[in-house]
Amino acid sequence: MHTTESKNEHLEDENFQTSTTPQSLIDPNNTAQEETKTVLSDTEEIKPQTKKETYISCPLRGVLNVIITNGVILFVIWCMTWSILGSEALPGGNLFGLFIIFYSAIIGGKILQLIRIPLVPPLPPLLGMLLAGFTIRNVPFINEHVHVPNTWSSILRSIALTIILIRAGLGLDPQALRHLKVVCFRLAVGPCLMEASAAAVFSHFIMKFPWQWAFLLGFVLGAVSPAVVVPYMMVLQENGYGVEEGIPTLLMAASSMDDILAITGFNTCLSIVFSSGGILNNAIASIRNVCISLLAGIVLGFFVRYFPSEDQKKLTLKRGFLVLTMCVSAVLGSQRIGLHGSGGLCTLVLSFIAGTKWSQEKMKVQKIITTVWDIFQPLLFGLVGAEVSVSSLESNIVGISVATLSLALCVRILTTYLLMCFAGFSFKEKIFIALAWMPKATVQAVLGPLALETARVSAPHLEPYAKDVMTVAFLAILITAPNGALLMGILGPKMLTRHYDPSKIKLQLSTLEHH
């Protein structure tokens, strides 16, 4: 008996350290002893850590070492560029301006990440990147030495758009779409089309836009930003909020479809605005471009599914490289031959078809594309911020732009709420989905300047309209991205039902199949 009891006590002591058994089920004496040992061991472990944090070690370590290392890397890159290209890397040169915008955007994003307000979720770093570019443009001394050619910025933004579309295509999960069915389709299509139509009507009567430009602006505003929505949905999902109802999955799946629709609508309107033919000719040309895009995307998508084969070395790297280069070539090449917008649809079809065959390998390819996006995101938002000058912002233009944006947002929120009324969600969940479907950032950062660049090249007399579109896109990012992020971070835990063990919950998507 004595031997058995001692063995049991020994097992209980070991299990206490590793198991998650509730404290009330453990012997209080053992608990007290273990807590005393734990406190002593923790104290012994903390002491050397405290000394390391109190005194600056030699050689330097920690944050200070990281700052110095990154600073030296930046300086060496500049020295190497200057030694190869000379004056291009000096103040006033094109590469110098690009470096300043890129690193300023990175610093702006890091600073915004460091800002922590109690009880308030962190703001998205892209807002800091946008403000960094805006600051560079509007500080006289810096602006005199920072110049980036319009051709360069146009190409970089087109590449950024390509990466967004690749991520959207790879992010479409066929299984989730089959489960969510009509609910996902409603959320992706309804609010986007209604906001685009509302923005077109309001901009036509308030901003005096022609109908073609009004709908072009509408599709610029119609897209939601996965860069803002997806990270917050992943955090909520990891903590078990709304998991059983499938709300995070629904929003993440629908965000890609929403962007696809908005970009397709924008490209169609852009081709109509800058074409010289009649309405019938434009419609026929649009249908032709769509057919060419679909055919090219299907052919290239099936090619990438089977080439390279699975027995090759560095398979993921080759697949990521092929998808990226093919899609960038499709987007830039279609612009070169006059098929504007065709490359975007080709990119979506290619990446979606290729991803359906890769299964588990798709996640690795997505990581490669995400790494490339981490490079182009500061460039994108820094260049967009640098396009906006305070001197060109007239108070009346800003006022009517904010009014148009606000009215269109109200229509979007109301439409989202009404469409979710028949999807089996509670009142609080519908409110949360409607507000979470508001943020704008990445698509607006790409499409807003695109109209301005096209006007500068093809139709300079239309440049005032394009500048107004750019202004509205800038204000949309500035207003909706931080507010949407704050609303999701604050209201998510309050309005969504939490399930305390999300790893054991099977998403009850079958409840949504009939809606």
Swiss-Prot record:
Record key words, sorted: Antiport, Cell membrane, Cell projection, Cilium, Fertilization, Flagellum, Ion transport, Membrane, Sodium, Sodium transport, Transmembrane, Transmembrane helix, Transport
Task: Give the residue ranges for region: Disordered.
Answer: 1-32
One term of GO molecular function:
sodium:proton antiporter activity
Q: Where in the cell?
A: Cell projection, Cilium, Flagellum membrane
Q: In which tissues is it expressed?
A: Expressed only in the testis.
- Extract the InterPro entries matched here: Cation/H_exchanger_TM (IPR006153), CPA1_transporter (IPR051843), Na+/solute_symporter_sf (IPR038770)
Q: Which residues form a coiled coil?
A: none
Q: Where is this chain compositionally biased, Basic and acidic residues type?
A: 1-10
Q: Which family does it belong to?
A: Belongs to the monovalent cation:proton antiporter 1 (CPA1) transporter (TC 2.A.36) family.
Function statement: Sperm-specific Na(+)/H(+) exchanger involved in intracellular pH regulation of spermatozoa. Involved in sperm motility and fertility.
Protein's name according to its UniProt entry: Sodium/hydrogen exchanger 9B1
Q: Which organism is it from?
A: Homo sapiens (Human)
Q: Which gene encodes it?
A: SLC9B1
